[in-house]
């Protein structure tokens, strides 16, 4: 075992400090406070799925720990799970799909990151996500939507990725695969559906006779024997009493969207951390079969991000303060390898309104920025990687009128109403000429004029779009005045949220964490955003949560002795 301590000192005021692994001579004679077969670090969707799937074998004793109350970033998410191949919801809505068709579609996102057979296995396994989740109290189903939307207002099954784009259609037949969780007590969702997805799973965990769920408990260091094999873990747990109650209140309120919007979350985070530091007590847990690291990514650790992905520091972290890289660091202290730590998924959606995709996007150099109809993660990547955090949509008066009209009639959640008002009134510039518009937004006038001229000429001449935009979305930008709507990262009321996509390297079949030489680290598994996953190359809505289910199941099947992904057909 060769420990890697590169990031141990990269902490913020809300981070969990991870210490180097503790070596002990003999685990059998050591003093332990608790003992289990399997220990799961982090109980978001990945950890919850790993715990519940492992618990199906009643002979396995499980302890699951979470820094907060459980749910993690998954509970704060849109609650979309990307699954297909013929799910119950798809069949009920008349959506035709197959595992092979889904895998072909996903190849646009996964690229060469995973073997084709792994992507097919993921697609085939996803057909079983729905009944399993429903068995634990989650509600899923239709109706389906045919619209091009970033997040559905009423539909619960929609095109959540690049399925309907020209590039997507070239690979597979489009099918709605974004499944939105519904309220467990009935009715349709009225808010972000992560709040409907996680609570039933957490309640199910509490009902399992062979799972002990230690809330308000954070992992501090791994414990290994003289050979370097994992034999336990040391955690810091807040004892019962007033401190635990106060911590739960501060931690929970700190994740509230309204409180965050009012910029009061930071104060609550500090209260929670102060309680952790003052009152948490060390607990040593003996682990016999294995550890699953499912503690999220590191989007809230801006010190770590400054080293790995500095271009994305202007993004807004999506998750909780527990997304601090602690799970990744724990793995590294026992020799785990990492990859793609510079890979960030940052989202800037150009739909809805759908007609924004008919505009021409440009960067600060005045050149075309991105294919406007692609999923928001591709746009966000272009804004940061090509535009240095800046970008605009260029529209003419007729197109601007259409966009404003679409915004007026579309159904919007409260946060969307606030965003659109700011975008139209505060984040859009106008001028009578393209050159005048360029001067207002600070891009080279000659380059912007040439970009728009070329864009229009290709449409007039029948030439293919330079970025493969669908023909139905192409229209000339020629009737002034002209408009530039900012899609940059500096918009307070329309920020670009981001998740980290890199993490521990895992075996595609077993979920075992690998060292830098590609050898398994004994008794160590990882899931969700602590690990490289199906969504790590390119993310689309629901793919991270789907990977949480998949990777959690995979680790569980390995711990049950079923060979990881090989056991997912059982």
How would you label these PLM feature ranges?
Residues 38-64:
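N-terminal Rossmann-like FAD-binding beta1-loop-alpha1 element of flavoenzymes
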Residues 192, 241-349, 545-554:
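Glycine-rich loop(s) and the adjacent beta-strand/alpha-helix scaffold that form part
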């Amino acid at each position: 075992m060769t420990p890697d301590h590169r990031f141990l000192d990269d902490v913020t005021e809300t981070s969990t400090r991870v210490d180097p692994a503790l070596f002990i001579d003999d685990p059998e004679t050591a003093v332990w406070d608790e003992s289990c077969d399997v220990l799961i670090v982090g109980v978001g969707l990945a950890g919850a799925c790993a715990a519940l799937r492992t618990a199906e074998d009643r002979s396995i004793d499980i302890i699951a720990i979470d820094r907060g109350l459980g749910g993690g970033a998954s509970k704060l998410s849109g609650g979309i799970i990307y699954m297909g191949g013929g799910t119950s919801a798809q069949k009920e809505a008349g959506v035709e799909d197959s595992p092979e068709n889904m895998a072909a579609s996903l190849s646009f996102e996964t690229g060469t990151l995973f073997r084709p057979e792994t992507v097919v296995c993921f697609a085939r396994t996803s057909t079983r996500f729905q009944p399993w989740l429903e068995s634990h109290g989650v509600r899923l189903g239709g109706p389906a939507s045919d619209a091009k939307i970033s997040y559905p207002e009423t539909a619960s099954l929609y095109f959540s990725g690049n399925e309907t784009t020209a590039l997507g259609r070239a690979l597979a037949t489009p099918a709605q695969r974004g499944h939105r969780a519904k309220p467990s007590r009935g009715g349709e969702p009225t808010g972000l559906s992560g709040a409907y997805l996680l609570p039933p799973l957490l309640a199910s965990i509490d009902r399992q006779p062979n799972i002990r769920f230690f809330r308000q408990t954070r992992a501090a260091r791994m414990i290994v024997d003289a050979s370097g094999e994992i034999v336990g873990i040391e955690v810091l747990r807040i004892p019962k009493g007033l401190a635990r109650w106060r911590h739960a209140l501060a931690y929970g309120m700190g994740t509230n969207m309204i409180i965050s919007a009012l910029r009061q979350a930071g104060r609550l985070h500090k209260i929670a951390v102060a309680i952790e530091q003052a009152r948490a007590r060390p607990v040593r847990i003996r682990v016999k079969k294995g550890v699953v690291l499912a503690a999220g990514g590191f989007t809230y650790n801006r010190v770590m991000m400054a080293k790995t992905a500095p271009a994305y520091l202007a993004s807004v972290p999506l998750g909780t303060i527990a997304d601090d890289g602690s799970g990744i660091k724990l793995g590294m202290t026992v020799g785990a390898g990492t990859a793609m730590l510079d890979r960030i998924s940052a989202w800037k959606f150009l739909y809805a309104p759908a007609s924004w995709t008919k505009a021409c996007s440009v960067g600060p150099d005045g050149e075309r920025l991105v294919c406007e109809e692609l999923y928001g993660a591709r746009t966000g990547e272009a804004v940061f990687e090509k535009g240095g955090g800046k970008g605009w949509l260029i529209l003419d008066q007729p197109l601007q009128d259409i966009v404003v009209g679409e915004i007026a009639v579309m159904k919007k959640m409260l946060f969307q109403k606030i965003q659109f008002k700011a975008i139209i009134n505060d984040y859009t510039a106008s001028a009578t000429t393209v050159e005048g518009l360029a001067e207002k937004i600070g891009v080279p006038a000659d380059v912007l004029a040439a970009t728009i001229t070329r864009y229009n000429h290709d449409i007039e001449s029948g030439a293919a779009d330079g970025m493969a935009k669908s023909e139905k979305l192409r229209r000339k930008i020629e009737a002034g005045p002209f408009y530039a709507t900012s899609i940059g990262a500096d918009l307070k009321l329309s920020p670009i949220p981001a998740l980290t996509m890199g993490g521990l390297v895992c075996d595609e079949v077993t979920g075992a964490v690998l060292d830098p030489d590609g050898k398994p680290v004994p008794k160590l598994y990882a899931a969700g955003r602590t690990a490289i996953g199906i969504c790590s190359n390119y993310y689309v809505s629901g793919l991270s949560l789907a990977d949480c289910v998949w990777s959690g199941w995979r680790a569980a099947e390995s711990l049950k002795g079923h060979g990881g992904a090989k056991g997912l057909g059982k």
